[in-house]
Amino acid sequence: MTKHIIVIGGGLGGISAAIRMAQSGYSVSLYEQNNHIGGKVNRHESDGFGFDLGPSILTMPYIFEKLFEYSKKQMSDYVTIKRLPHQWRSFFPDGTTIDLYEGIKETGQHNAILSKKDIEELQNYLNYTRRIDRITEKGYFNYGLDTLSQIIKFHGPLNALINYDYVHTMQQAIDKRISNPYLRQMLGYFIKYVGSSSYDAPAVLSMLFHMQQEQGLWYVEGGIHHLANALEKLAREEGVTIHTGTRVDNIKIYQRHVTGVRLDTGEFVKADYIISNMEVIPTYKYLLHLGTQRLNKLEREFEPASSGYVMHLGVACQYPQLEHHNFFFTENAYLNYQQVFHEKVLPDDPTIYLVNTNKTDHTQAPVGYENIKVLPHIPYIQDQPFTTEDYAKFRDKILDKLEKMGLTDLRKHIIYEDVWTPEDIEKNYRSNRGAIYGVVADKKKNKGFKFTKESQYFENLYFVGGSVNPGGGMPMVTLSGQQVADKINAREAKNRK
């Protein structure tokens, strides 16, 4: 008899798991509370402006392509992606700009400010991150290893310690090899992919630089939501039954097994396995009603990653100095991280990510206008949340900073504005305290590991998404779905012996 899989949540991790389970011959039902598939990969359009509400950068497209290849199909028949050799532009408070290209040689050629020594150090750092990337690919990515003990068993103690560089933080690893203060800050902010601090995260996450340099940085034509649409189409072709606008209210259990879910319609649906794309702590808290003591213990080790104050701006002008992806850096990176991740306050001088897809895709804004998305990282929702007045003052800080750093009269040119706070993110995606990136990567608290993909409390409950390994970001959450499918397939194969 065909076994039934229930997937809770249609984010990239959930839809990826659903596709792989259907490809493996299971009956799969996916329940998504919103009316779209993709989770935070969401879309907003108004007054001729188009905005990616969630992620704006596609990396490691091969992870997505694998899902189509399992069905003997090509992703290019479903969605068009475009490589961006000019990866981004970094603006610094003193007026310095650095353009990051795909390739160290190209970066050197396009930045007269960088010396021969700077480029040699950057190449040396790339070589270091390549070694980490290669070893993480072998075990962490290919085999879905979930814990430090599994890493050590797979690679051997000495090999794991040296090649994963568990001795240093990410910023220590950078500062050890890079002397240019601008490059130090730019490379440290690669930690944005997982919403953490480069001063707290383990050095293993330095691999993010090599990953982007080797795999490239991509744009999904028409908006990144088209990638989610492509995955939804593939899932339906593989026989996944998708229920949008349907919320799971709780998970039913018997001893250490989950038996099914109760929907907001009152209907009970049985399952042999449940895969939750809802974050781990909210799943335990709201769907399984774990006790406060257990939840507090889990949250101490697996604290939420950062959230964001996200502004979607339609502006009645063009800023020629902007590229597709831009970063406006802070005067003091350490203080910025300290305020967000330790003091838990809105930062005085935030580093700001600004994406302007209209630079690549002119369909995203009216002629002569630009669509600007602004994202500084801020703390997740605290026990005493920030007020409307706090956010209003923070908005002014952001606009002041951008105008000071070259976006002249930005306020005057804003003709459309849509803002998302951590509270909006929590409400729409049921994320833990409004975090964007799942669990924070912290060398002391969790050595950079997230929750394991298999529940520690229930034998047939699995998790996917940013709160489990291999972590946050579009390719990683998609990979988590594939890894969970592999685990269930291996378990079923073992049971049949």
Swiss-Prot record:
Pathway: Carotenoid biosynthesis; staphyloxanthin biosynthesis; staphyloxanthin from farnesyl diphosphate: step 3/5. It comes from the Bacteria. GO terms for biological process: carotenoid biosynthetic process. Its EC number is 1.14.99.-. It is an enzyme of class 1 (oxidoreductase). FAD binds at V7, I8, G9, G10, G11, L12, G13, G14, I15, S16, A17, A18, I19. Transmembrane segments: none annotated. It catalyses: all-trans-4,4'-diaponeurosporene + 2 AH2 + 2 O2 = 4,4'-diaponeurosporenal + 2 A + 3 H2O. The keyword RNA-binding does not apply. The keyword Oxidoreductase applies. Keywords: Carotenoid biosynthesis, FAD, Flavoprotein, Oxidoreductase, Virulence. One of its GO terms (molecular function) is oxidoreductase activity. Gene3D superfamilies: FAD/NAD(P)-binding domain (3.50.50.60). Its cofactor is FAD. NCBIfam families: crtI_fam. PANTHER family: 4,4'-DIAPONEUROSPORENE OXYGENASE, PHYTOENE DESATURASE. Belongs to the carotenoid/retinoid oxidoreductase family. CrtP subfamily. Involved in the biosynthesis of the yellow-orange carotenoid staphyloxanthin, which plays a role in the virulence via its protective function against oxidative stress. Catalyzes the oxidation of the terminal methyl side group of 4,4'-diaponeurosporene to form 4,4'-diaponeurosporen-4-al. This is 4,4'-diaponeurosporene oxygenase. The gene is crtP.
